[in-house]
């Protein structure tokens, strides 16, 4: 228990010695004129708010003796011989800025504990958001090799390609699709069922750069951001027979919208069929060249499934693009056989179904050789 000499060192000579549990008189008395309630709370007295300088007087002794002895005490006051309750005492502690050896150890311990609390809080927030342990994503080349090796049937498309859209990570952003090809679009192409022998088409970005022309309208600047069944029939205005055969609702359900990588280019002859005769002349605005993307004012599906050439000009052999049928696309086979299309296209579709046992050779190449022999 501290004696009178201990109290006299930090205090003024006019002060009265205090009992344990009460703060020094000079510090509490100095603050009691401006904030009597705060000094009364620091002294632990009930009448300290109105008593002024007597906030830590005899009433403080009475209330301090009634408190539980296990209340937390101020560590800085304890280093200098005082036992002060810690509650409400931080602003009025006389040694809060003390730089002695014991008080500096207290300050260092408080800084370390505060840093640990902040670190634990930050780690908890990162684990909730999933930032601290990111899942490593495979590169585009690994996805290509993996998905091409898993393709067992070259003529069948993936079953989810008729209605499901590709994942958002593989779709190009509007800024990225402005006139150049982004390499992360290639896994979306392989997920739609490429063959095993078209690795030269997949790995060449220059081949795909001819398809991603910047659109004139902002609605179509994303590649797959068109309605699923927006089929404005391109052949309706010029050939009525094809329009009538395509106009029914079962045809809309059986024909899926082809993505733009299946539009043919000069090197992609695996997806092309040279028609020896074209019986449906159409105007030039509906005709699809390999270097020109689909017009934005047309439906995005009809102009990509069938392309016609006008007149019997054989200098440029334009291609009739077809989609290899899956189990959901039986309407495409019946459409090509019932509509007045060329016999070569229907024969190519039927032969593609029977060529599933030969993964190395594609059925269209056989049809092309037969047409050249004739």
Curated annotation (Swiss-Prot):
Sequence ranges of Gly residues compositional bias: 41-63
Disordered, as annotated region: 1-73, 154-176, 317-374
GO process annotations (BP): cell morphogenesis; developmental process involved in reproduction; germ cell migration; intracellular signal transduction; male germ cell proliferation; male gonad development; male sex determination; male sex differentiation
This protein's record includes keyword Transmembrane helix: no
Disulfide bond residue pairs: none
Ranges of Low complexity composition bias in the record: 24-40, 326-346
Entry annotated with the keyword Iron-sulfur: no
Record key words, sorted: Activator, Developmental protein, Differentiation, DNA-binding, Metal-binding, Nucleus, Phosphoprotein, Repressor, Sexual differentiation, Transcription, Transcription regulation, Tumor suppressor, Zinc
GO molecular function: chromatin binding; cis-regulatory region sequence-specific DNA binding; DNA-binding transcription activator activity, RNA polymerase II-specific; identical protein binding; metal ion binding; RNA polymerase II transcription regulatory region sequence-specific DNA binding; sequence-specific DNA binding
TM region positions: none
Main subcellular location of this protein, as a coarse class: nucleus
DNA-binding region location: 70-116
Phenotype of null mutants: Severe defects in the adult testis with hypoplastic testes and disorganization of seminiferous tubules and absence of germ cells, due to pre-meiotic germ cell death in testes. Sertoli cell fail to differentiate. Female mutant mice have normal ovaries and are fertile. Depending on the strain background mice also show testis teratomas: deletion in 129/Sv strain causes a high incidence of teratomas, whereas these tumors do not form in C57BL/6J mutant mice.
Subcellular location: Nucleus
GO CC terms, sorted: cytoplasm; female germ cell nucleus; nucleoplasm; nucleus
Gene3D superfamilies linked to this entry: DM DNA-binding domain
Biased composition range(s): Polar residues: 354-364
Function: Transcription factor that plays a key role in male sex determination and differentiation by controlling testis development and male germ cell proliferation. Plays a central role in spermatogonia by inhibiting meiosis in undifferentiated spermatogonia and promoting mitosis, leading to spermatogonial development and allowing abundant and continuous production of sperm.
Family recorded in the similarity comment: Belongs to the DMRT family.
Protein's name according to its UniProt entry: Doublesex- and mab-3-related transcription factor 1
